[in-house]
């Protein structure tokens, strides 16, 4: 399936009518998680700050501390969309910054993609490095800001701030190699 674009989309113009939101989260689960997390009508920003794919982990990832300071003094709820074991990292971040990151104990963000989709649906915005969360958010049609390394994967193309694959994504690129402060 991954090679189908080579057959059907041979030119940038072939992406002009890309459908957004072609996946849908389970509405009942979204409602259940909204209640479980006590979100009400609060503005929610879902965050994910690293990739666990070993080949590109270092260049695509940043620490939660680097990432989370983007949200200092902003009146929002941060919702953890990061997969993997990040409990200690979140506790340490909250302790050192005073910024709380809400976690959903009933969803394994790595193994339960339906649950992750429901969490993404709860968000007003997703902010993430390039990883599975970004692609799922794009497929759900969720407004997403993607933080890209200086040398990004080919599917993000060059010198673009939009994604031809997912119209709801906005791309932010490092200006200097391994320097996230330039975004």
Predicted feature residues:
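Catalytic machinery of carbohydrate-active enzymes
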Residues: 1-183
């Amino acid at each position: 399936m991954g090679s189908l674009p080579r057959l059907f989309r041979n030119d940038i113009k072939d992406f002009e009518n890309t459908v957004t939101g072609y996946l849908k989260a389970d509405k009942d689960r979204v409602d259940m998680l909204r209640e479980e997390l006590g979100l009400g009508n609060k503005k929610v920003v879902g965050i994910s700050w690293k990739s666990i794919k070993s080949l590109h982990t270092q260049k695509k990832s940043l620490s939660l501390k680097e990432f989370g300071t983007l949200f200092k003094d902003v009146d929002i709820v941060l919702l953890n969309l990061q997969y993997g074991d990040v409990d200690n990292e979140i506790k340490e971040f909250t302790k050192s910054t005073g910024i709380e990151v809400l976690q959903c104990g009933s969803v394994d963000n790595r193994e339960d993609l339906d649950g992750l989709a429901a969490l993404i649906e709860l968000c007003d915005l997703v902010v993430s490095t390039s990883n599975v969360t970004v692609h799922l958010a794009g497929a759900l049609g969720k407004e997403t800001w993607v933080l890209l390394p200086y040398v990004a994967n080919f599917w993000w193309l060059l010198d673009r701030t939009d994604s031809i694959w997912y119209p709801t994504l906005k791309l932010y690129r490092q200006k200097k190699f391994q320097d996230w402060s330039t975004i």
